Amino acid sequence: MCRCSADSSPVDVKDILNRLKSLSAAEEFFEALGGPYDPKVLDVSRLHIMKRMGQYLAAEDFSHLPDRVIAARARAILERAYCDFATSAPLSHRVFKVLKDHNPNRPVTPGRTVVPLDSFLKPFEKK
């Protein structure tokens, strides 16, 4: 596990939601909220973790809450999203639409044909 803040200083909770909105890298979220993470898990599942965190945050009502409570809830949500993917493969959760729409157990829809890429390349091969 990686401790995001090497000096383990307290998390700055002032205006935390607006600060989180300005972040882009997953590591920045863990650093801002003071949460630990395993870089190996983050390397594989960062987009899934961030998407799931967004889903969890969207379900929360932070209006009229003090910044300290918002920061604590946001950290708990980040840790929950992280744990979702730390113990299982990202594909098993299907957080993205393309994964939700694709069921590997469902046969290909009749009438849809898969054309191998090799069939396109053959006319361009040197003889």
UniProtKB/Swiss-Prot annotation:
The keyword Transferase appears for this protein: no
Keywords noted in UniProt: Nitrogen fixation
InterPro entries according to UniProt: NifW (IPR004893)
GO biological process: nitrogen fixation
Pfam families per UniProt: NifW
Keyword RNA-binding: no
Similarity-based family: Belongs to the NifW family.
Functional summary from the UniProt entry: May protect the nitrogenase Fe-Mo protein from oxidative damage.
Quaternary assembly: Homotrimer; associates with NifD.
Protein name per the record: Nitrogenase-stabilizing/protective protein NifW
